[in-house]
Amino acid sequence: MRLAILTDIHGNVQALDAVLAELDRQQVDEIWSLGDMIAMGPDSNEVMARLLDRGVHMITGNHDEAVLSLLEGKGHPESYVHTRPHHEWVARTLKPVYADALFKLSRTIERDVKGTRVYGIHYHIPTEKRGVPITEEPFHDIVEATLSNMQSLYGAYEADVICFGHHHPEHVFRDDAKHYFNPGALGVARDNLARYGILEWDETGFAIHLRAVRYDKRAFLEAMERNDVPQRDVMFRLFY
């Protein structure tokens, strides 16, 4: 059994296509996408088309939910005020069929695979905020990637493997009870690597693999310019 873990694709269809081609060669059994499929990059519609066509199991992230909140007329998170012009552009250009698909998604996913409880979430949400909208800032602030911090965030989760994203660098930690796995952002990096992860089971147990594949970053950057993506200069400086 091979379960692929993707997160933070962020509208980067070039990076996603490179990863999907790799997954085809590896013959994975299931794919999860742990939120932030859309926004930042120029091709949110194309990304959603690929994921739906592949039957990828998706959950929402903060960018997805911020765009959906605008589409519903329910406002925009105060802490994301700097991203509002960009999110408004995504909301205007996102095709209704893909918005509808995003509206149907949950914030979490879980599966028992050969006795291993696997749980996916975009990032930790405190218990008291599990049901609140994105305008009430449900996702925990990003913390430094250390084992003790992961234990503080996810230690009470009833699972053996906690998979998440949001914080773009990859990190893998383990204690006696749990594995904490962030494969890294697929679509946002300084280099030209698209990152993802594989959980693999055999007769002896399971293993976690970090993976990365090169993609055509020049084509991605050209698409950002061609599509006149709002706030792209800021994103180039901070993320790409």
Q: Residue locations for each model-derived region?
A:
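Active-site neighborhood of divalent metal-dependent phosphoester bond hydrolases
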Residues: 54-111, 139-155
